[in-house]
Amino acid sequence: MEGRYLVLSDVHCREWVAESARALMDQHGLHEVVLLGDITHFGPPQFAEDFIKALGAKCYAVPGNCDPPGTLTFIESSAISLHGRKVVVNGRTWGGLGGSNPSIFRTPSEMPEEEIFRSLSPVMERGMVLVLHCPAHGTFDTPFSNKHVGSTAVRDLIRRTEPLVVLSGHIHEDRGVAQKEGVWYMNPGAAKDRYAGMMELGEEVKLTLLDLEV
């Protein structure tokens, strides 16, 4: 079996999430965490390191659009950063990208679609685990406006490369699990809203939505 992982996104500086996540890890026998960004809420960047250390587990992470640029340094000091890079985890390539495409909110870590494409292209491999903050356009990317706001660059790269699993957050309102054209997708929901997920990789992929206890 490749591994079992707690998946968290959109903590937005809620300190209580770390304790609740530890309890969930104990309950499900999990020892590693995937963080999908927006660990802070427009800072302070140091919170990312403090939060990751409070989890007490090995972490793989990308920053979110609400994480100021300096946050990446603190992620790199306390977790395995997947922002614009890839690593091999239990024999499978994992890679990712943080931040998001442009939004109406003009948050600190947004980038144009062209930059997303350039940054993510070297990371992509068929059959990989893709760890993102921003979702692909058309998949778990619909806020209350009911308009798709995900990245077209991410969507196009997924279609071209066919990863095994795509994990993303960012859109708090569009939580779920789906399989489309052979690719598994999960948005675990916002941890600040007491939501989480679990990824199990082995002979089969199993993605499960979980709830955090306050």
Model-derived features: where do they sit?
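Active-site-proximal beta-strand elements of phosphoester/diester hydrolases
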Residues: 2-12, 91-100, 129-133, 185-189, ...
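Core catalytic region of metal-dependent phosphoesterases/phosphodiesterases
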Residues: 4, 8-89
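Active-site neighborhood of phospho(di)ester-bond hydrolases with catalytic His/Asp-centered motifs
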Residues: 7-10, 33-38, 59-65, 82-83, ...
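Active-site environment of divalent metal-dependent phosphoester hydrolases
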Residues: 12-17, 40-46, 65-72, 88, ...
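Conserved catalytic scaffold of divalent metal-dependent phosphoesterases
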Residues: 13-16, 66-153
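Active-site charged/polar residues at nucleotide-handling catalytic sites that mediate phosphoryl
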Residues: 28, 125, 161
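Conserved beta-sheet core of the metallophosphoesterase superfamily
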Residues: 60, 142-203
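Conserved hydrophobic/aromatic beta-strand scaffold that supports enzyme active sites
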Residues: 86, 96, 131, 177, ...
